[in-house]
């Protein structure tokens, strides 16, 4: 449908233009989530994921415009008889599936593992669109144009193959990570200790995360993002997992010796972003894990770090022994905020409903505008904390977060 010489009217031309823009954005969308290291470190996965979402929906809407205009321009023509049209229709169906399951309401109803598997159909859609574009697209006939598009597709495909497949496989084979043992940390929270070879050469820092695939024979291809909950060591790593959903429930039942496939490390909420001076960290639930690793790793002065730890129940507070050690030896101040949620939009528990968000933050750390502020937790909660931090004058360059969820 991208270009029939028999219908060179304005409707057909606009349809072809919409198709070209859609293809451009679709390739950009693929590259944004190809996990190219220098792009990921420059912008962060949370920003790239947001751009990926925007470009994806924009590309899909342009694709729909292309389909509608082509149907109008070529009314009466048997389009299914055109070369590559069956593949194009299959590509459209695959992309519709991806878009529908990416709408927030639908996404909330799906478990991460199932959503991730469905999302992979986007690659099928991109690949199946190729015959349609190059076989009947008149805009693709000039040699220079064909070279550009083949190069763009090759770059996108190569980025995915290198950084999503080859590099993770190479690191997996090189470091040979296996599960050493599993310890409970709190109700519904377990830590997985892993050992491997040459872990001192694994380019990971405290605060980063991997996508983990545990080769236990069940759902092996399903990856889950979990951050390190302790500083990386030359002989061991630790992750801590909240036991919800299929993937994390499997993790809690892993046996020692289970091999692990890793993809990463990802994330830029590390010591590299630390500007120096006092630190205030705010964690909600399992979001404490990367912040605990940073508390061990950052070179803040004695008594210059505060951890605000938000949980629903006292028994959900994890890592008490480590936090007590950090309090005694490095002067870390622990501020537990325990209780059910307050009104929508607040990061405080219901007990503190009389406090405004910004005022509460200032009362915890009066000079917080001069601190590096690290935040990790659910998206809505993190957004509330960021809003309060900006209200009390924390510069954008000192606000750090990593949203590695879906």
Spans of model-derived segments:
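Short helix-loop-beta connector
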Residues: 273-277, 368-369
């Amino acid at each position: 449908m991208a270009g029939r010489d028999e219908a060179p009217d304005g409707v057909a031309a606009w349809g072809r233009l919409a198709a070209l823009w859609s293809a451009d954005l679709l390739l950009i969308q693929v590259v944004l989530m190809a996990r190219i290291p220098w792009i990921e470190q420059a912008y962060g996965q949370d920003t790239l994921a947001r751009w990926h979402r925007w470009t994806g929906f924009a590309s899909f809407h342009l694709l729909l415009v292309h389909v509608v205009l082509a149907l109008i321009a070529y009314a009466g023509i048997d389009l299914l008889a055109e070369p590559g049209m069956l593949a194009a229709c299959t590509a459209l169906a695959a992309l519709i599936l991806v878009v529908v399951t990416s709408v927030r309401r639908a996404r909330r109803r799906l478990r991460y593992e199932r959503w991730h598997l469905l999302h992979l159909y986007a690659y099928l859609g991109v690949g199946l669109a190729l015959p349609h574009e190059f076989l009947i697209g008149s805009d693709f006939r000039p040699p220079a144009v064909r070279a550009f598009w083949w190069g763009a597709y090759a770059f996108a495909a190569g980025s995915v193959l290198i950084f999503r497949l080859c590099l993770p496989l190479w690191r997996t084979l090189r470091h040979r990570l296996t599960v050493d043992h599993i310890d409970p940390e709190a109700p519904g929270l377990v830590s997985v200790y892993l050992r491997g070879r040459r872990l001192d050469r694994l380019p990971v820092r405290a605060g980063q995360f991997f996508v983990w695939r545990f080769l236990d024979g069940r759902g092996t291809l399903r990856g889950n993002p979990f951050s390190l909950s302790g500083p990386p060591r030359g002989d061991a790593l630790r992750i801590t997992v909240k036991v919800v959903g299929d993937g994390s429930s499997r993790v809690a039942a892993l046996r020692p010796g289970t091999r692990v496939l890793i993809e990463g490390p990802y994330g830029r909420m590390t010591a590299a972003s630390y500007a120096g001076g006092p630190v205030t960290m705010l964690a909600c639930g399992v979001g404490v894990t990367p912040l605990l690793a940073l508390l061990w790793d950052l070179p803040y002065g004695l008594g210059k770090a505060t951890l605000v730890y938000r949980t629903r129940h006292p028994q959900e507070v994890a890592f008490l022994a480590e936090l007590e050690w950090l309090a005694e030896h490095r002067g870390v101040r622990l501020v537990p905020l325990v209780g059910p949620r307050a009104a929508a939009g607040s990061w405080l528990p219901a007990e503190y409903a009389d406090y405004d968000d910004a005022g509460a933050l200032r009362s915890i750390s009066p000079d917080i505008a001069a601190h590096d502020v690290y935040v990790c937790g659910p998206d809505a909660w993190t957004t509330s904390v960021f809003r309060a931090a900006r209200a009390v004058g924390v510069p954008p360059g000192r606000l750090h977060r990593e949203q590695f969820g879906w």
